[in-house]
């Protein structure tokens, strides 16, 4: 999910939380104290694309760096909860604007996931506000930290971070990364079309460029109508896009946040969901349960249709992620 959409849902842009690795273990630490990881050789080497085609539906999660006002240890609380659902990998977002400073926190959290939780991590790498030199430096750091997978994104434009000119589009970033290191490279896709694309045909044509540049796996923007995703898959396959495509799912937990997100990110609300919001929107507990049930229903239908994978936008809420994961655990393995 883009930082714009995340901001619409949490009301703040994720900020940098770690400076470098200089503490031995997790626990309560004063703000600003730094973290050190044991970056010994891992027992596995895993590219995200290798997870697919093995007889089960891939199930992954997204997290974001905690807000500046949150305690440093809050990321551990999220990850402690997510490890129990055994995701196939966890992606880590960036902050609005995609500045190199915010991408640095993405790198550090991805390293925590890889080296402390032993779960494959996929770091978001953006280029809208970065030079080739800055991207190269970030990639070198990721490789040094044992992070082998990246999600290559243009990133959201932000007036606080004037755009650089080294990369015009995400396909250029994909090609650049593939030439510079043995990374698994994934890309984003939009079942209802990128907000800046003039039409769906052009959008799929641009997505094909991204895959031809070297993207080995795609993660979709969130959507609420599975038929939109199925039509998108058909367009992709007809265009010759054969890489695995994960369906991005976000549970509806807050009426105001979802309405802001829809206005900013372009996802549409089907009639079934608008009825749900109208009925339960003023009752937070009821909406939470109804929203989780809606997400479970979406995921069950997608798995039954044989989708490659499910990417759950957790919004750093491991309890909701676990409730959803537990509900679909058996059908994922069939």
Model-derived segments and their meaning:
Residues 63-66, 93-97, 124-130, 155-157, ...:
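Active-site beta-loop-alpha junctions enriched in small/polar residues
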Residues 38-61, 68, 274, 333-334:
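N-terminal amphipathic alpha-helix/helix-capping segment at the start of soluble metabolic enzymes
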Residues 43-49, 72-81, 85, 98-119:
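Glycine-rich, positively charged N-terminal anion/phosphate-binding segment
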Residues 62, 90, 142, 210, ...:
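Conserved, mostly hydrophobic/aromatic
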Residues 58-74, 121-133, 186-202, 279-293:
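Active-site mouth loops of central-metabolism enzymes
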Residues 66, 87-107, 155-165, 216-229, ...:
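Glycine-rich, proline-tolerant flexible connector loops at the mouths of alpha/beta enzymes
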Residues 165-190, 238-292, 297, 328-334:
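Active-site pocket-lining/capping segments in soluble small-molecule metabolic enzymes
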Residues 11, 25-26:
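Glycine-biased, low-complexity coil/linker segments
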């Amino acid at each position: 999910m883009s930082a714009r959409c995340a901001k619409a849902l949490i009301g703040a842009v994720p900020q940098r939380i770690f400076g470098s690795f200089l503490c031995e273990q997790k626990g309560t630490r004063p703000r600003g104290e730094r973290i050190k990881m044991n970056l010994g050789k891992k027992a596995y080497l895993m590219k995200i694309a290798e997870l697919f085609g093995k007889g089960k539906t891939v199930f992954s999660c997204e997290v974001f760096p905690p807000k500046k006002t949150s305690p440093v240890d809050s990321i551990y609380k999220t990850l402690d909860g997510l490890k129990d659902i055994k995701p196939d990998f966890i992606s880590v977002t960036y902050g609005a604007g995609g500045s190199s400073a915010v991408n640095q926190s993405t790198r550090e959290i991805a390293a925590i996931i890889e080296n402390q939780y032993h779960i494959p991590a996929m770091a978001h790498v953006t280029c809208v506000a970065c030079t080739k030199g800055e991207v190269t430096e970030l990639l070198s750091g990721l490789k040094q930290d044992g992070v082998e997978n990246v999600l290559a994104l243009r990133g959201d434009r932000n007036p606080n971070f004037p755009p650089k000119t080294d990369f015009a589009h995400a396909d250029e970033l994909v090609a650049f990364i593939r030439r510079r290191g043995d990374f698994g490279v994934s890309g984003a896709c939009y079942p209802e079309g990128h907000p800046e694309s003039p039409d769906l045909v052009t959008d799929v044509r641009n997505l094909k460029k991204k895959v031809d540049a070297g993207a080995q796996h795609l993660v979709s923007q969130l959507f609420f109508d599975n038929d939109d995703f199925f039509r998108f898959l058909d367009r992709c396959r007809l265009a010759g896009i054969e890489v695995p495509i994960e369906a991005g799912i976000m549970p509806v937990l807050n009426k105001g946040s979802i309405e802001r997100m829809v206005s900013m990110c372009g996802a549409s609300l089907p009639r079934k969901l608008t009825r749900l919001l109208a009925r339960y929107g003023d009752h937070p507990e009821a909406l939470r349960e109804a929203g989780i049930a809606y997400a479970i229903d979406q995921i069950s239908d997608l798995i039954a249709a044989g989708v490659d994978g499910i990417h759950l936008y957790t919004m750093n809420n491991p309890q909701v992620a676990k409730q959803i994961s537990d509900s679909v655990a058996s059908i994922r393995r069939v």
